[in-house]
């Protein structure tokens, strides 16, 4: 707004300096619009506008509106001025004579002259003489100073380019009448002009580099005339000046474009923040709607209980009918005694085993209740999209000291902004709202380090595996509610069939796959909590294998593990199961038969990470390589090498995210093969574990920090 007012003031100043200062108009003072008469309303209004301290007040605008009729006439004549084609008619109008019109249109006020750029010489003259000297074509400046060119020189430098473009267009039109454009354009050395965008001609054209004279060094060497050499020298200098001016014009355009880009970037950042705030409010409202649904269900249950109580009370009001209905006969009394004695005998014989079965039934009922409760199924009406608008490599935030020691594993749900993390020493799984960097839950129950976890994408369930040989299933909603109340959470169900540390797990629909150091893989039915299949991985190669990995990094989470996991990673889909083991082999299983159907060989050390999609399986190993395999042909398609052992990886169709016990998390672009890092100058620790979903990357570091990035 300030710039607009400034420009308006300069415009009024320019017009008024002509209208007020003109001395050549003395006829018809009352009626002439450009008259100096103080009774002229237009002149009087302009004079007041320029001299008043508050020229933008309402009174001035009212006076301007009163002269609307005169201004309308001027507007019509102005349209006539700009519509004339001949030079003479350009200065012909109904308001004034040609001489006056020429003065008005060609006049430059002092304010406009002061805006012209000054050279060092003109600045010194201004200081000495108090006036501004304009840069002329013959002026020269010191080579160490940037040359500043006048507007006239800019026009003059553009004329050869414009003339050449016009000549080319005329040539095209003339030849187009004789032949087809497809035959003409190749002869001219140009491609057919297919306009796909406003900048295509600018990118392909070289007209701005055009030199008006063909300077042939061989021809210059053969010139015998000094005058001819001086003429060519002058032309060359002129062309050099013109090229310099064109270069300066192009540089000015670049600066202007940069400024526009900065402004657009600032606007984009503000809009992204606005979208992020909107999505937070959307998630909050969905939580409110979910809470209302829970309360409505509670009201329905309370109503049913009240109905049952009222029905029972109505029966108590008629005690005689109750006595008659409940009085047993002699035969019924005898049968009841026999039934009681039989039941007592059964209880005595099975009492020892009943204690063990009660807990299992309770867990089974808890699982059934969890999956039958519709509130535990994940659903969102509005999906988050803000991550699409961030630039790749942007660090969103850091959760400092999420745990006191190194992060062993983590997982997150980008649709609900929830993050689960585990540390090496605290044996607690923490639940976070990662957008606010706030802890919202804690899962306590394991008695050893948590080595693996997964957040179910369909239900509010978290599965965790530990070195205590157990797998625990948690209700995330219950965990959050108990944490807000200040109470400890309890696991929804515990799977304790493994005999040694659980090293990896994977949830696939209703199935849960778990791998252990006891050399077995178990398949569980999540709805019942029962083990339905066991895979034996006690292969001879695993027993004889010894890792060649050298202990060289004290911060490495891998080195804190006494033994390399026998089964480093697993993943399943439908009836297919993939396992990566410490002998460096990838085995593909058919779960319908329980047999290995393929073996992929290539890694020279233990496999720590593994994941596959419809066509590709990607594995990371302690040998410092990532290998990509084509599942359709079983062929190795690519090898990506790093300096240190791979501790974790994740990928999608575009990128592979890698943690290799180094300072930065690595990114590999699957489309162009480029490698780049998530640069974090504030951190001096190592990246140990990564998860990558929908452009979000979560990295767990050796000091317990969690980094949140966009890839």
Swiss-Prot record:
| Coiled-coil regions listed in the entry | 224-281
Q: Where in the cell is it found?
A: Mitochondrion outer membrane
- Major subcellular location class: mitochondrion
Does Chaperone count among this protein's keywords?
A: no
| GO CC terms of this entry | mitochondrial outer membrane; transferase complex
Renumbered to this chain, region (Disordered) spans 116-139
- Per the record, the domain of life is Eukaryota
Give me the WD repeat coordinates as residue ranges.
402-442, 445-484, 497-536, 560-601, 602-639, 641-680, 682-711
Membrane topology reported for the UniProt record: Peripheral membrane protein
Record keywords, A-Z:
Coiled coil, Membrane, Mitochondrion, Mitochondrion outer membrane, Repeat, WD repeat
Report the family membership.
Belongs to the WD repeat MDV1/CAF4 family.
What is the role of this chain?
A: Involved in mitochondrial fission. Has a partially redundant function to CAF4 in acting as an adapter protein required to form mitochondrial fission complexes. Formation of these complexes is required to promote constriction and fission of the mitochondrial compartment at a late step in mitochondrial division.
Protein name, as recorded: Mitochondrial division protein 1
Organism name: Candida glabrata (strain ATCC 2001 / BCRC 20586 / JCM 3761 / NBRC 0622 / NRRL Y-65 / CBS 138) (Yeast)
Its ancestry begins with: Eukaryota, Fungi, Dikarya, Ascomycota, Saccharomycotina
Gene symbol of the encoding locus: MDV1
